[in-house]
């Protein structure tokens, strides 16, 4: 934390923390602040006026980022027979069923997203305590429990990002890399925010989207003027 605070302080003179910046300006500042020796991830944090303790205010879903994430996503698919072959052909990194159960229970977690066909959810369900806390449990509402495994694998590989509101009412999502052109990051962030707007729960009261901010892995957070998105 000390390192992040020091970097944030060092970059403090580049922008006014109290101001909501137009999206393109905020991205330019973030890119200037991203001076680490690796290609930092650009993250969006959206504060929502929802109480996720209530099921009718849960915001959870996915969005396909038009310019991708810049990250190599390792996709694991639980499937058998023909569907397993379709998943492999679509680019899945690991495909299996019962054979993967013991491997994952033994601590192997070298994957980022999980997809499953409905007929093997009995196997996958036994991994709930492992996959659930990591937000990797396949879910029909997210489209990750499906027989159309090839389509879903391709979408994930192309830049689909899953999100889920936290207990604090905040959604975090990686939307690209610091090396991305400003225009590409604008497109990706706009796609995410528009998706969240479409998903406003009917039970949500008051202001739905309270604050939008962006940051890089090691940089400070910058507030974004929502009217610019």
UniProtKB/Swiss-Prot annotation:
InterPro entries assigned: Ribosom_uL1_bac-type (IPR005878), Ribosomal_uL1 (IPR002143), Ribosomal_uL1-like (IPR023674), Ribosomal_uL1/biogenesis (IPR028364), Ribosomal_uL1_3-a/b-sand (IPR016095), Ribosomal_uL1_CS (IPR023673)
GO terms for biological process, alphabetical: regulation of translation; translation
GO cellular component, one term: cytosolic large ribosomal subunit
Pfam families given in the database record: Ribosomal_L1
Keyword Transcription: no
Keyword tRNA-binding belongs to the record: yes
SUPFAM superfamilies: Ribosomal protein L1
Signal peptide residues on this chain, from the entry's feature table: none
Keyword annotations from UniProtKB, A to Z: Repressor, Ribonucleoprotein, Ribosomal protein, RNA-binding, rRNA-binding, Translation regulation, tRNA-binding
Molecular function in Gene Ontology: rRNA binding; structural constituent of ribosome; tRNA binding
Family: Belongs to the universal ribosomal protein uL1 family.
Stated role: Binds directly to 23S rRNA. The L1 stalk is quite mobile in the ribosome, and is involved in E site tRNA release.
Assembly, per entry: Part of the 50S ribosomal subunit.
Name of the featured protein: Large ribosomal subunit protein uL1
Native organism: Magnetococcus marinus (strain ATCC BAA-1437 / JCM 17883 / MC-1)
């Amino acid at each position: 934390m000390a390192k992040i605070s020091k970097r944030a302080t060092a970059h403090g003179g580049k922008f006014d923390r109290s101001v909501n910046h137009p999206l393109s300006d905020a991205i330019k500042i973030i890119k200037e602040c991203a001076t680490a020796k690796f290609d930092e991830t650009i993250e969006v944090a959206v504060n929502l006026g929802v109480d996720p303790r209530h099921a009718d205010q849960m915001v959870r879903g996915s969005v396909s980022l038009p310019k991708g994430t810049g990250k190599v996503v390792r996709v694991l698919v639980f499937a058998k027979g023909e569907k397993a072959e379709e998943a492999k052909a679509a680019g899945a990194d690991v495909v299996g069923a019962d054979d993967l159960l013991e491997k994952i229970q033994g601590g192997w977690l070298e994957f980022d997203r999980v997809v499953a066909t409905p007929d093997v959810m009995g196997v996958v369900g036994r991994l709930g305590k492992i996959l659930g806390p990591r937000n990797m449990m396949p879910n029909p509402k997210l489209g990750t429990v499906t027989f159309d495994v090839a389509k879903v694998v391709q979408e994930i590989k192309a830049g689909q990002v899953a999100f889920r509101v936290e207990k604090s009412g905040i959604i975090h999502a990686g939307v690209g890399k610091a090396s991305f052109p400003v225009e590409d990051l604008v497109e990706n962030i706009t796609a995410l925010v528009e998706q969240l707007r479409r998903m406003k729960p009917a039970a949500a009261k008051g202001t739905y989207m309270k604050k939008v901010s962006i940051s890089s892995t090691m940089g400070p957070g910058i507030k974004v003027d929502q009217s610019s998105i």
